[in-house]
Amino acid sequence: MVGVPGSGKTFLAKSLSEKFNCEILNRDLIRTSIFPKKYINHSKLQNNIAFEVLFKVLKQLISNNRPEYIIVDGKPFSKNYEIEEFKNELDKLSAKLIIIHVTASIDIISSRLKNDLKNQYPLYRDPKKDSKIYNTQLMINEFDKINFPHIIIDTSSHIKEVTKYCFNKINEFIK
């Protein structure tokens, strides 16, 4: 899953996991699981450590269990080099990468982020320590245009419609 915070990556991941009966590895969940709550600062270092753990789990699952699909969530993959590094590692494991670029309108993303801020939902981010993401346009501008084959999914519609559309696009993509 690739996309800015608030685009609907986690919501779509959960819905797809039910449709595909697949696993979700979420960097944000890992971060909140391995760092004591009072020390979580959402720094680049903490994000990198959490992603390293996620990738070790991913490698183990691919090497030993070979599930048909694993959704990687909680890491925006905002830069092409991040996607390329991840793809190269998956290639070593003979695993295929399907990039799903999750989008929504700026108004919807802003609304979702404000809702997160209001609810202080700690799984995804700490609004007081990472206020940059609450400037939606600035955040979107910091993302590279994806230079790899990918599926674009707009999560502005009802989740059942979005999931069905995404499911069909994935099936087209893998043919």
Set out the residue ranges of the language-model regions.
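Conserved nucleotide-binding/hydrolysis micro-motifs of P-loop NTPases
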Residues: 29-31, 77, 103-109, 158-159
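Short, amphipathic alpha-helical "lid/cap" segments that border enzyme active or binding sites
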Residues: 51, 55, 159-170
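Conserved beta-strand scaffold positions in the cores of enzyme catalytic domains, especially
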Residues: 22-24, 97-101, 150-152
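P-loop (Walker A) phosphate-binding loop of NTP-binding proteins
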Residues: 4
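Conserved substrate/cofactor phosphate-moiety recognition/catalytic segment
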Residues: 7, 11-63
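Glycine-rich phosphate-binding loop used to anchor ATP phosphates in small-molecule kinases
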Residues: 49-93
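Small-molecule kinase domains that catalyze NTP-dependent phosphoryl transfer to phosphate-bearing small molecules
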Residues: 118-165
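Conserved phosphate-donor/acceptor-positioning beta-strand/loop module used by diverse small-molecule
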Residues: 91-113
